[in-house]
């Protein structure tokens, strides 16, 4: 179902039932003054920021994830070039904040999670639970490629923990035999 949603042409965003992985086209007013820099790695593992902006569409406030930039591009004017009248993106439900990540440094605009309370403090607004992920051929920021591939690392984790258990058992047997 996710794959099918991502393959269809984007639909006009006005008065549509919002759902995860819905491809949309819309226009809106992007707020560049309250731009959020969310720490993240790009697809090759290089650290940088995802650029996230408040956007007003009709009477509703959303966040739009415009993509990834390297650290040196932070606060540069060239990352704010976008056609606000022709926005194509993918609607996705905002993920829950992780308690394992550091706290956001709102005063420095250095974010690790999109904590809704922190966003309210920073912007003064409440936003939809859906985030728009920009699609298109932009270079800075470079939009995140949304795929139907859902991460499944269970096999890797099982092998890792099984290997550790075997290693500990062998170490235990070695020292036990040595003592007798």
Predicted regions located by residue number:
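Surface-exposed, charge/polar-rich loops and edge strands
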Residues: 1-15, 19-180
